[in-house]
Amino acid sequence: MRAAQLFTLTTLALATSPYLQAEEDTTETGREQTLQTITVIGTKETASSAVKGYVAKRSSAGTKTDTALLEIPQSISVITADQIKDQNAQSISEALRYSAGVTAEPYGVDNRGDYYALRGGSSGSVVLDGLRLPLIGSWGSVHDEPYAFERVEVIRGPSAVTYGQNPPGGLVNLVSKQPQKTAQHEIAIQGGNNDHRQVAVDFTGPLDQDGTLLYRFVGLTNNSGRQVEYAKVRRDYIAPSLTWLPDSKTKLTIYGQYQKDESGNTNAFLPWAGTRLDAPGGYPKISSRLFIGEPDWDSYGGQRTRIGYSFERKLSDDWTLRQNLRHDNANGHYTTMYADCCGWMGPRPSDRTVNRVWYAGQPTSDVTSADLQLEGKLNFARFEHTLFFGVDSAQERSTNPSVSGLDPTPFDLYAPVYGRFAEPVADFGVISPTRTTQVGISVQDQIKFDHRWVFVAGLRHDHAKVTVDDSASVGVDESAWSRRFGLVYLADHGLAPYLSYSQSFEALAGTDFYGQTFKPKRGEQYEAGVKWSPIGKPYMLSIATFQLKEKNRLSTDPNNPQNQLQLGEVTVKGFELEGNARYQNLEVLGSYTYTNARDTTGPVKGTQLESIPKHSASLWAKYSFALADISGFSVGSGVRYLGRNWGEGAVIDVPATTLVDALASYTQDKWSFSLNAKNLFDKEYVATCLGRGDCWLGTRRSLVGSVSYRW
């Protein structure tokens, strides 16, 4: 099996090599020819602009300044809107499937949110246009709609200097679609298996003849099923925005967003036996369509509103002032049932039945985030400085009341009977809000010497405070300094080796079983790598190796399962390879990740971290035909290798699997037609099994047809 998987990946890689070699041959031949001068009129790429194809050259994700990716001493991926569209990503987690250093969808079919692990860490933080989203996560949240974004940027490794509190593995920055000066309109309709139905619109352009007022409106409605029965999904989303350009030095954008999600629950927490292990009594594997809740009671979703603005003023040719503010309000609900199988390390007590646990929660969150940025450029002799000074804050008021209990009625996993559950009255009692505040001050200098050397240094101070209203428990009040240093050498032919050191800081709310507060979680990383992106060529290749250490990681107390100890320390050593390229009509992107993530001091010392594979790889290619008789046709295919992973303490493993995706599309004038297949061969697999006794099944085949009209 491994040989077949490696052969598939190698074959796809070799299939693309003649095109890349042809580019080199053409370049060499061109040196001996006198070519006609051609004037090209286009839009210069910026850190937030749309990108044609899959290759982005600039980003602000790593520095909060508009910087070439070659000059950032950190591993960063940019997933463009074209890639999201071509791969028909229906969630942020799906958009991350082909990125290096990311364990996407570790819980398989899970509609509770976007889950992924960066460099062996827990799910990374998410920021929207550089501003933090809720600081305290909870079940019942509304996760983001990928159609709304121009880019999804993955910043790997500690990023406290740039963003404040975040896990050491990294974070994801979502870049919203912005109003444009050129009028563009799109209407897109989708339909597919599992009753997938979706209509989306994206309109933008000027509102006046002078182009001082620009607008954008993004809207979507989705009414679909899932591979799990009774888990219907309904989403409504609108995002209007308006940009005012009173002069060439000033820009103000005001925006809003409303999203409402309603669905059944896809999560089942299925037992080992019947998923990863053989079912007892000669029964078959548990169906991936099994709904383990109650159709008339289970619900998951909520609504979210956002409103904010971004302001930019050029004070001079060298200095720019930026200010951003956003308010997020979210109200969720989560009523569900799942299998009571935690703690079982073998077959179920019965051949075909389990008991179920019921859960009800109503999380809420109000977050106000703001920042003030000053960027300046100073030149001294052979030195070019890009200075950045920033102040940011985030204030959140959240509640997460929940109750749960055990339903003693046995549930048949092979012939489920619904309607016998006596719905409980969820009494949440007195609800005490949690208030979280973060304030950070940062300074950074990007120094370029002789157009060859780039040195990046940054320093940040964070103050984080967490309190619970009407509670006698001790809150969190922590401060910390974080640093980053990096060096890049800009060699000839677009080659850029680099070294970097960075830190992370994250205050941990709550106490242990005995009432003692937790220390902040800290992380530090050493990274070395090479990037390659020739000037004027749509190529971007990056290679990185790193060692990341996380301190004060929480671990379960082996003597008291209800307690958590801060004895854990995790060391992650890894290697990542990622490349994006376009040659004429061929677009290719690929990645390979090696992650050795081990607990070095906890109760399961020396074992690979739960759900994190050591090896993973992916390759995607799209070819657009240019011949007259088939002009407008495109075909694409991708291979995803998901390596073997383990439950906590390596008590159970999940075998590796290889999945295939495919695309066929046709564009004629203003019309586009496409068909996407994900998990083309409908492979049934287990995504993850936890050491406590439960497993998650992977996503089955998805077929979606799309029709869009653009003008």
Go through each PLM region and give its residues.
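Extracytoplasmic beta-strand/coil segments of soluble accessory domains associated
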Residues: V55-I76, A81, S93-R132, E150
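Short acidic/polar hinge/loop motifs at secondary-structure boundaries
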Residues: A104, Y115, L131-R156, L174-S176
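Outer-membrane beta-barrel translocator/receptor signature
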Residues: L135, Y147-E150, V161-P240, W244-K251, ...
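Acidic/polar loop-and-plug regions of large Gram-negative outer-membrane beta-barrel proteins
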Residues: N222-R226, I238-K314, N329-S365, T409-Q438, ...
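Structural signature of Gram-negative outer-membrane beta-barrels, strongest in the C-terminal barrel
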Residues: T243-D247, S365, E384-E396, S432-E550, ...
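Membrane-embedded beta-barrel scaffold of Gram-negative outer-membrane proteins
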Residues: E312-R326, A330-T336, P497, K521-R582, ...
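Gram-negative outer-membrane beta-barrel transporters
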Residues: D450-R452, Q547, Q566-G649, S706-R710
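C-terminal beta-signal and adjacent terminal beta-strands/loops
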Residues: R640-E648, S665-W711
